[in-house]
C-alpha cells in the first residue's frame, strides 16, 4: 500500500491560504526548483502531478473525458469547456503531466527567463524595464510573479515567446447547427524589436526601442477577402494604443483605422477579436483592476497538440450537431493555474465587463479565457492548445531545438453558439509557410508596403 503524504485537501488548503498572491509552488517556491532541477516535480505533491493521483484512480492517462464522466473533473475545467463537454459533445483525451519545464515554452525563452530572473521592475508609468532603466531584455520578466499585473505584463510583452513568428493559419466558422459557414486561409506575423534572444541585433533593434511589436494578419482565401490585410504597430508604452493600418483590395490603398475598436471581428462570421490575441491582445493599461481570484489544478492542452501525421499538420474534429465543432484535443493535469480577472478601462463601447484568464503557474502561459458581457453573464471563451513540435519520430525545428508553439484554438460565443476554430498549419495558399525566428518576416509581412504587395498578389 502506497502512503500518500499530501492529499487533495492539503493542496486545497494551500491554494486557499495563498489567496491573492501569485507566487507559485506548493511544497517549495516553483522557480527555485526549476532553476535547480529543470523540472517542477519537487514543487508539487504527487497528487498534483498525475490525473490518476488527483482522481484516486477514477480517471487515468489515456482515458477520454466525456459527458459520462465530466462531473469527476468539473472543478478542473473552466466553465465554458465544462458546458461544452457536458452538453455539446466535446471530448478530451487525457495524457500524462509534463514536468520538464523546457517542453512547455521555447528553449531559449526559458533560458533567458532563468538568466534574467530578478532584473525586471516597473518604471513610473508601469512599463517593464531592467534595473538600469532600459526596455526588457528577454524571457519572462516575472517568473516569480507576485501579482496579477506581473502575470499579465509578462504575457503582453511577448505573445508567442519567439523574436519573430509567422503562422500559416486555417480558420473555420461553425454555426450553432454545426455547419461550416466560412473557411479562411490567412497568415499572422509577429516581430519583437526589444527583448530579443535569437535574432541579431539583440536584445534591441537599434532605433526601434520605443516599439514593443509589429504584428500583421492577411487573408489568402476565399476570394471575397483575398488581399485584406491589417498591421498593428505597438508602442512600448503600455498606456498607448497600437497604430492600426489596413489594406482593403477594393480601395487599393492603405488606410489607418481607429485602434480602440478591438472588439469587432475582422472578417464575416468570425467570433475572434483583436482583443483576444494570446488572451492579452490589448495594451496592458487599457485594462485595469487586475486581481487574482483563484488558483488550483486545471486540465489543459499544454502538450501533444501537433498533428505530425498530417502533411499539413491539420487536425481532426468531433462534437456538435455534425461532428465539426471541436478540435480533437489532448489535455493534462496542470498542477497549478492562477486565475486573474481584469476590466476594460479605456474602451467606452466595450461589449465586455471583464475577462477571466487562467495562467499556467509554471510558465505564465495563458491556458484559457472567458469574457463576460455588461450584465455579468458568460459571453465568449478562448482556449488554445500548445505543443513541442516533435511526435512519432518527426520534428519541426527552431534552430537547435524543436519548435514550440500553439497548435489550435477554439473561440466560442456562448450566447449565440457560434464557434471559430483556428489551427496552425505547415502552409497556406500562395506559398506562405509557418516559420520561426526568421528576420526577413519584417520586410515580407510587417510594413505598409508589404500589406500592399500582399493585397495585390
List each language-model region with its residue ranges.
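N-terminal secretory signal peptides
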Residues: 1-14, 21-29, 36-37
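Extended beta-strand-rich segments in extracellular/periplasmic secretory proteins, especially
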Residues: 113, 117, 186-208, 215-221, ...
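Acidic, serine/threonine- and glycine-rich low-complexity intrinsically disordered segments
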Residues: 230-231, 236-303
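Short glycine/serine/proline-enriched coil/turn segments at secondary-structure junctions
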Residues: 224-225, 237-238, 332, 347-351, ...
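A generic structural motif
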Residues: 218-222, 245-249, 343-345, 372, ...
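Solvent-exposed N-terminal domain segments of exported/luminal and surface proteins
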Residues: 38-241
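C-terminal soluble interaction/assembly domains
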Residues: 348-424
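Cysteine/selenocysteine-centered motifs that mediate thiol-based redox chemistry or coordinate metal-sulfur cofactors
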Residues: 291, 297, 396-449, 454
Amino acid at each position: 500500500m502506497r502512503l500518500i503524504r499530501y492529499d487533495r485537501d492539503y493542496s486545497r488548503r494551500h491554494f486557499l491560504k495563498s489567496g491573492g498572491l501569485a507566487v507559485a509552488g506548493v511544497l517549495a517556491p516553483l522557480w527555485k526548483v526549476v532553476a535547480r532541477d529543470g523540472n517542477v516535480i519537487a514543487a508539487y505533491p504527487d497528487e498534483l502531478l498525475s490525473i490518476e493521483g488527483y482522481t484516486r484512480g477514477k480517471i487515468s492517462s489515456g482515458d477520454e473525458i466525456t459527458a459520462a464522466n465530466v462531473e469527476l473533473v468539473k472543478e478542473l475545467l473552466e466553465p465554458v469547456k465544462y458546458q461544452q463537454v457536458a452538453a455539446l459533445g466535446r471530448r478530451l483525451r487525457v495524457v500524462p503531466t509534463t514536468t520538464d519545464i523546457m517542453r512547455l515554452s521555447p528553449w531559449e525563452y526559458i533560458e533567458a527567463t532563468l538568466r534574467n530572473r530578478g532584473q525586471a521592475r516597473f518604471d513610473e508609468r508601469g512599463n517593464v524595464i531592467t534595473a538600469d532603466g532600459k526596455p526588457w531584455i528577454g524571457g519572462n520578466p516575472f517568473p516569480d510573479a507576485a501579482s496579477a499585473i506581473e502575470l499579465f505584463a509578462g504575457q503582453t510583452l511577448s505573445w508567442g515567446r519567439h523574436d519573430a513568428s509567422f503562422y500559416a493559419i486555417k480558420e473555420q466558422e461553425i454555426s450553432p447547427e454545426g455547419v461550416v459557414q466560412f473557411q479562411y486561409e490567412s497568415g499572422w506575423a509577429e516581430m519583437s524589436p526589444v527583448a530579443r534572444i535569437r535574432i541579431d541585433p539583440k536584445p534591441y533593434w537599434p532605433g526601434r526601442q520605443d516599439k514593443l511589436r509589429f504584428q500583421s494578419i492577411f487573408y489568402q482565401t476565399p476570394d471575397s477577402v483575398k488581399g485584406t490585410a491589417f498591421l498593428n504597430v505597438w508602442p512600448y508604452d503600455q498606456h498607448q494604443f497600437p497604430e492600426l493600418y489596413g489594406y482593403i483590395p477594393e480601395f487599393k490603398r492603405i488606410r489607418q483605422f481607429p485602434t480602440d475598436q478591438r472588439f469587432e471581428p475582422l472578417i464575416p462570421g468570425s467570433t475572434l477579436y483583436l482583443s483576444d490575441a494570446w488572451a492579452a491582445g490589448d495594451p496592458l493599461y487599457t485594462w485595469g483592476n487586475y486581481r487574482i481570484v483563484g488558483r488550483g489544478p486545471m486540465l489543459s492542452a499544454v502538450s501533444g497538440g501537433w498533428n505530425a501525421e498530417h502533411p499539413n499538420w491539420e487536425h481532426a474534429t468531433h462534437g456538435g450537431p455534425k461532428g465539426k465543432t471541436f478540435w480533437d484535443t489532448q489535455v493534462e493535469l496542470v498542477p497549478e493555474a492562477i486565475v486573474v480577472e481584469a476590466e476594460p478601462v479605456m474602451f467606452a463601447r466595450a461589449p465586455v465587463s471583464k475577462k477571466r484568464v487562467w495562467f499556467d503557474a509554471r510558465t505564465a502561459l495563458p491556458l484559457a479565457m472567458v469574457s463576460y458581457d455588461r450584465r455579468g453573464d458568460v459571453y465568449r471563451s478562448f482556449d488554445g492548445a500548445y505543443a513541442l513540435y516533435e511526435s512519432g519520430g518527426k520534428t519541426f525545428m527552431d534552430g537547435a531545438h524543436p519548435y514550440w508553439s500553439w497548435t489550435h484554438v477554439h473561440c466560442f460565443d456562448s450566447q449565440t453558439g457560434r464557434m471559430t476554430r483556428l489551427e496552425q498549419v505547415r502552409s497556406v495558399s500562395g506559398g506562405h509557410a509557418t516559420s520561426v525566428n526568421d528576420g526577413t518576416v519584417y520586410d515580407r509581412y510587417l510594413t505598409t508596403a508589404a500589406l500592399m504587395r500582399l493585397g495585390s498578389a
